[in-house]
Regions:
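P-loop NTPase motor domains
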Residues: 1-171, 187, 228, 232, ...
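Aromatic-lined carbohydrate-recognition surfaces of secreted/lumenal glycan-active proteins
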Residues: 180
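C-terminal regions of RecA-like/P-loop NTPase motor modules
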Residues: 183-289
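H-loop/switch region of ABC-family ATPase nucleotide-binding domains
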Residues: 177
Length: 289
């Protein structure tokens, strides 16, 4: 399963990777794991010298050394070098996340040049955790989903598979996207439509006319509903669920607005309240405007 995720990782890293290179890469993955004593046998994952613990997993630097050994894989090694020895070498480390923590923050805000790789890596970790225990309720939120959905077919299929199967793991998936053109760009919109078809509830905010027409077609909206979408104010939306459409207005409580606002004036006002009232500042005021 990990090797499948690695293949997706490399299609994002090397968009023009060839079928031959993918085959050579697959062989390199297997060799890299074998060097750590790990084979297709799940038992090989366990460290015999430390019962109950896994063996040390290979990192990108280990794969890099294997790729350097053959002329035909040298191009991939050269591209990978930036993630091993260059400016993005933070990818070249063992995972050090304590998954027993109540809260985990996977901060990728400083990885703008490798945002696609970082987003996929974080999502792959979260999806793996979500599948560990079917008895626990969970939800995965994928913001700006178009960025992965429009990358390539392997990545798009990975996203679609989450939406198709997460209910079987006791969970739910939510995606948010502002760029609908890219959301439906791959293979004639095959994957974007697939996500929509596996999503029970859709919430549509204000859209430009061109994008509203796309939504009208995909959700079979009326002309009046499409026109309303183009005229929505902040807080207005159309909810589509179970073949029923409803125009709504969302009103945040003061606390909700304080926690999510990015408006400069709101943040300044919140800062002043915090300085005056401390943590009780969040309790001041009623419904947000």
């Amino acid at each position: 399963m990990k090797i499948q995720s690695l293949h997706i990782f490399f299609t994002i890293l090397i968009p023009d990777i060839t079928h031959e290179e993918r085959q050579l890469l697959d062989e390199a993955f297997i060799i890299t794991y074998q060097k750590k004593g790990i084979t297709h046998d799940n038992v090989s994952l366990w460290d015999q010298d430390h019962p109950g613990k896994y063996k040390e997993m290979p990192i990108l630097g280990d794969l890099y050394q294997v790729l350097l050994e053959k002329e035909e894989t040298r191009r991939m090694a050269n591209i990978l070098n930036r993630l091993v020895n260059g400016s993005s070498s933070n990818f070249n480390h063992q995972t050090n996340i304590d998954s027993d923590n109540k809260y985990m923050i996977l901060d990728i805000s400083e990885m703008q040049s490798d945002l696609g790789l970082a987003t996929f890596t974080a999502l792959d970790f979260v999806w793996s955790k979500a599948k560990e225990d079917r008895t626990k309720e969970k939800a995965i939120f994928i913001d700006e989903c178009w960025a992965l959905l429009s990358t390539n077919e392997l990545t798009a299929n990975y996203i679609l598979e989450i939406f198709k199967t997460i209910r079987g793991y006791g969970g739910a998936a939510v995606c948010a996207s502002q760029d609908l053109e890219d959301f439906f760009s791959l293979k004639g919109g095959k994957y974007g439509k697939g996500v929509l078809n596996n999503t029970k509830t859709k919430i549509i905010l204000n859209l430009e006319h061109k994008e509203a027409e796309v939504v009208k077609k995909e959700l079979d909206l009326s002309e009046a509903e499409m026109l309303a979408i183009t005229r929505f104010e902040r807080g207005n939306a159309l909810i589509s669920t179970n073949n029923n459409n409803l125009l709504v207005e969302f009103k945040a409580s003061r606390l909700e607005k304080d926690l999510i606002t990015t408006d400069r004036k709101d943040l300044k006002e919140l800062k002043e309240r915090l300085e005056k009232y401390g943590e009780t500042a969040y309790e001041k005021g009623g419904m947000a405007k």
